[in-house]
């Protein structure tokens, strides 16, 4: 009742009370009232950041994009942002028809800007992301949650270009995650290689290349002088950009995996030598670690399992280990992406938790590689339910894992 009475007045004494009554209006479906509350606060405090942000999001959710942009530009001024441009961008595929058909394809784009936080491409009010790098733009530091209710439009605040790239180059991009690097940056290069274009132009990549990025680039035979390196969290203006589309369909992923196996064939163990049983350890990380990993290894060791820590191995060593495996037991994590180097007959036991079981990348990959996969899901956490999130460590039922392995042997 106190909240209900508060919502009937335009007097807002502080940010907390303001957000409370705006939230209540939105919950009741009173969009117009929520906007009036914002305007009322701005009538008292003309450049109030809280009111401007709430009003901008209300307008964006209501589809009044141009009005929202004007409000967000006022936020820039309040925050003292200089040398930035805030504008709306409509999300678009490189080629929606070919994307829907699940094809592997590429497209030339002229006079574009590339932001190097989420590696999206922007031009003339269009943002290319879904088949370019496919990160969730809602969390982009340039977007900061400013996505329309229907998901078709974003508002981004971009700095002026830090890099001017006049020569044609290939959009490779960068990612801090080993798995994402393989799937978002390397796999798509298959399309250009088969078209005879992969080495015709320099590659656009992040300047702070991780060791595994450097190693994959070297293994693919690209020369250091053929890399165009740009810093992260910046904008690069590109005169002409060759953009291979992400491989997202089973059909395209399958072609990409086959290409990678062909390119790295000299590093793969012979199929007859693929007899090893691997437990893939995450003991070198804290995120989503397996709390009873030692207990699990003790249970699997009598069955001939050896434990490896991929984070402590070079790319070549990881490829060798996974390509020589007959059974792989692994907690859900980036290193399991190396299963694409294992033979088709290799069985996978994926260990996951209820917090991340919706992440189905490895099941999708197994479907394209035709590798048998068993997923074991745990709800055994060291925390109470309200504290659990996607990176929470978990325990696994070792008996279930052993039974799954015995069924696969």
Predicted regions span which residues?
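Canonical positions in the second alpha-helix
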Residues: 5-7, 40-41, 74-75
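Structural register within alpha-helical repeat arrays
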Residues: 20-21, 55
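Structural signature of tandem alpha-helical TPR/SEL1-like repeats
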Residues: 28-37, 64-71
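The feature primarily captures lumenal catalytic ectodomains
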Residues: 54-57, 61-73, 77-409
């Amino acid at each position: 009742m106190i909240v209900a009475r508060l919502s009937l007045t335009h007097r807002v004494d502080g940010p907390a009370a303001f957000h409370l009554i705006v939230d209540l209006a939105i919950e009741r479906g009173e969009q117009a009232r929520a906007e009036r509350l914002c305007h009322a606060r701005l009538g008292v405090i003309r450049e109030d950041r809280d009111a401007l942000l709430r009003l901008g999001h209300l307008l964006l959710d209501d589809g009044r994009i141009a009005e929202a942009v004007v409000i967000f530009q006022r936020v820039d001024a309040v925050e003292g942002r200089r040398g930035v441009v805030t504008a709306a961008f409509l999300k678009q595929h490189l080629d929606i028809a070919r994307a829907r058909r699940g094809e592997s394809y590429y497209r030339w784009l002229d006079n574009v800007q590339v932001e190097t936080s989420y590696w999206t491409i922007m031009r003339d009010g269009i943002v290319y992301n879904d088949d370019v790098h496919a990160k969730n733009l809602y969390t982009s530091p340039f977007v900061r949650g400013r996505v329309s209710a229907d998901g078709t439009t974003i508002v981004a605040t971009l700095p002026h270009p830090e890099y001017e790239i006049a020569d044609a180059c290939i959009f490779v991009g960068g990612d801090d995650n080993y798995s994402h690097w393989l799937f978002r940056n390397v796999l798509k290069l298959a399309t250009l290689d088969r078209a005879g274009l992969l080495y015709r132009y320099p590659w656009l990549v992040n300047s702070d290349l991780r060791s595994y990025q450097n190693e994959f680039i070297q293994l693919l035979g690209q020369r250091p002088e053929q890399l165009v390196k740009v810093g992260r969290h910046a904008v690069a203006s590109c005169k002409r950009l060759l953009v291979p589309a992400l491989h997202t369909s089973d059909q395209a992923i399958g072609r990409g995996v086959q290409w990678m196996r062909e390119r790295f064939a000299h590093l793969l163990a012979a199929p007859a030598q693929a007899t090893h049983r691997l437990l893939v350890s995450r003991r070198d990380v804290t995120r989503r670690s397996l709390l009873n990993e030692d207990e699990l290894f003790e249970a699997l060791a009598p069955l001939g399992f050896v434990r490896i820590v991929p984070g402590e191995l070079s790319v070549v060593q990881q490829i060798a280990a996974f390509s020589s495996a007959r059974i792989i037991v692994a907690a859900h994590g980036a290193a399991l992406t190396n299963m694409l180097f294992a033979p088709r007959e290799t069985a996978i036991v994926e260990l996951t938790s209820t917090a991340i079981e919706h992440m189905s990348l490895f099941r999708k990959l197994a479907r394209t590689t035709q590798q048998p996969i068993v997923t074991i899901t745990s709800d055994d956490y060291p925390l109470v339910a309200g504290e659990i999130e996607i990176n929470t460590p978990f325990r696994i039922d070792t008996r279930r894992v052993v039974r799954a392995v015995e069924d696969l042997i």
